[in-house]
């Protein structure tokens, strides 16, 4: 069982890197901060623009330093198209028909950049020798970087468990580090889940989301592991007795 105690150190650090990956992919996003602190996750809307408008090379969002409302920074938005004259008419027609509908006009669960201007959205085209660019203003939604909160949490847990194991390895009871991992990871996760957007729609009707509900029994399991040195062995025994007939 000492192997499991060591494994949780690597698992904690691995979870930290997974959450960093989620951050860069704009996955498992946090709720709006409703303040001027936060992160605007632009990757999802960049993908949508690429799929809705033709000949897009890349999309850039730049903070203007101004705010539409508290927690909603105004972004200078540039869409760079392929620079070929024969494509221009199709690009202009697509922008005229679709641009004001690509961005949502209000905050929803997964909206990160919105267009509160709707029909009054002002945009302009600019051509240089190297590129053909569409420029307009959009409004970002400041959100909690919940992935980074969780990554930092797991990293601290991993380092803490390693230090404890390195200093007290000869005196640690089997299951003690495993229990400590469950206690810290799932107690902190319970609170971090509270600032994440729900992952599936049915969670909207729940008082606690699924991440919080799953954290409760795992926290209790960690409590059991931590205070009972023979806990893992007992769990295995109960598991065996449940699925297999003793007489057989």
Q: Which functions belong to the PLM regions below?
A:
Residues 1-248:
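A feature for loop-to-transmembrane-helix boundaries and adjacent hydrophobic helices
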